[in-house]
Amino acid sequence: MASSFSGVLQLTDLDDFIGPSQECIKPIKVEKKAGRAAAKIQIEDDGSYVQINPEGAARKLEKAKITLNDCLACSGCVTSAETILITQQSHEELYKILKQNKTENPLEHKVVVVSVSPQSWASLAARFNLIMQDTAQKLTAFFKQLGVHHVFDTNFSRNFSLLESQREFIQRFKRQKEDKKSLPMLASACPGWICYAEKTHGSFILPYISSTKSPQQVMGSLVKSHFAKEKNLKPNQIYHVTVMPCYDKKLEASRPDFYNQEYETREVDCVITTGEVLRMLEQEGLSLSDVDPSPLDTLFGSAVQEEPVGHQGGGSGGYLEHVFRHAAQELFGVHVDTVVYKPLKNKDFQEVTLEQDGNVVLHFALAYGFRNIQNLVQKLKRGRCPYHYVEVMACPSGCLNGGGQIKAEGEGSKDLLQRVEDLYNTVRTERPEEREEVAQLYGDWLEDKDSAKARQALHTQYHAVEKINSGLTIKW
């Protein structure tokens, strides 16, 4: 049976793709003990392993297991979490919870919440030849037919990510003379990039990375904190699923930083990709086109959302544009009507500048794909990086081309990507500063923009992964 997760062979069209390391995925430091050999290993008839100590006592050995946390703490691979068997992060796990809700004691039921990314809406819309609004409403109805209680749009949580990125950049810009690592500020929404940074460049690169949570994890905070309180639920009474264009989002959700120790629950319990949603539809024998529509839910009482609402600035979230416009106005009193991009070597590396009196006062860039990311890091290491802010994404062409998106059938990959981009751009856009509900939540939920509660809910931290030298990593 074919694996439900994508593999390296499925990504060969990404010419700068960095595959998993061929060394041991989980190198283990072996501590030598003094004395003679302590035990022998015996293989039983059932294939199990038994340790026999010098006194003749036997102890059955357990099989080694690799968890998502092991992946995060391991320096054996650079990225591509999709090549690892992720048992607790799949659509089968969602089915398991939905089945338990139908068969177990009602007191043990979970309120199931699904939060869908706009990139996933666009990929599904392209596959079924639907407009974005119909796709969102039909997918909402599909999930609710399965037993999901609430379906949200992560465009809402992205408002917080954009606003916090704007505020953080202003703070960093103002302290750049005192803090040499305050700029350039590097975007933090892409978990593939974060994983690469922590494992490969560690303590050198981490101070430059924005502390703002991604929209997925902000949505996790909203659902397990604000929404839970509104519904008189404990965080562990909610099972929160996100639908994402990227397999690395599964790793992001599994970071210890996003685990609530008090209630023993994660902000996001399960991440499924757009491709896995397609498999769910196929498993149910349904075409999304044939599902009757249902409005999206909102985080505000009984209100419903008739259509997805997006943001300007491209299919990866629009971080560069929003931070650039805000910084131009806040720092230099300049209102930017149109952000003009200047492509450099390719469309995945572009620059944006603001000039005053013939001088460049703001110098921004976007860097998509690992080839461009590596070039960016080398500029930083040589002290030749001219940028104040960089929108960094691991996938060439950004999130709309994520590894978890639906693959092309009967058309070229570039043609499909163009259709997905066109559909994504049909959605009505909004400025996060103008969203009344966002301003309301800053007061009611977070108490204040600068509160400790806001810091905990909307920001995170990163961890350099120490390289482990072990005999198990030797190449023969």
Curated annotation (Swiss-Prot):
Residues that bind [4Fe-4S] cluster 1: C24, C71, C74, C77
GO cellular component assignments: cytosolic [4Fe-4S] assembly targeting complex
Domain of life: Eukaryota
Residues forming coiled coils: none
GO biological process: iron-sulfur cluster assembly
MF annotations from Gene Ontology: 4 iron, 4 sulfur cluster binding; metal ion binding
Keyword Iron-sulfur: yes
Keywords: 4Fe-4S, Iron, Iron-sulfur, Metal-binding
Pfam families reported for this sequence: Fe_hyd_lg_C, Fe_hyd_SSU
List of residues binding [4Fe-4S] cluster 2: C190, C246, C395, C399
Gene3D superfamilies for this protein: 3.40.50.1780, Fe-only Hydrogenase (Larger Subunit), Chain L, domain 3
Functional note: Component of the cytosolic iron-sulfur protein assembly (CIA) complex, a multiprotein complex that mediates the incorporation of iron-sulfur cluster into extramitochondrial Fe/S proteins.
Assembly: Component of the CIA complex.
Similarity-based family: Belongs to the NARF family.
Entry protein name: Cytosolic Fe-S cluster assembly factor narfl
Organism per entry: Xenopus tropicalis
Gene: narfl
